């Protein structure tokens, strides 16, 4: 899977989100997702939301994924 494909999946799953995806090899990915959908949710719940989108791709097309999941307010503060 290429970075732009992963980005598109995440943008579809989280409408209005700001998504940045990087990968040195199209197997190991780093993603930052900023969305209102994360408001009021702890980090673990946010990550589960992302993994639910990826489903069976995790461990296959996506071997490793480093996540940074933020609300818009958290992103502004950083």
List where the protein language model places each region.
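Short, solvent-exposed polar/charged micro-motifs at secondary-structure junctions
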Residues: 29-33, 75-78
């Amino acid at each position: 899977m290429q970075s732009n494909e992963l980005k598109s999946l995440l943008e579809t799953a989280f409408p209005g989100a700001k998504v940045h995806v990087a990968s040195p090899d199209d197997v190991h990915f780093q993603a930052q997702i900023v969305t209102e959908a994360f408001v009021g949710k702890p980090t673990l719940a946010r990550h589960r939301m992302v993994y639910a989108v990826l489903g069976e791709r995790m461990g296959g097309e996506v071997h490793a994924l480093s996540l940074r999941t933020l609300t818009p307010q958290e992103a502004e503060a950083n």
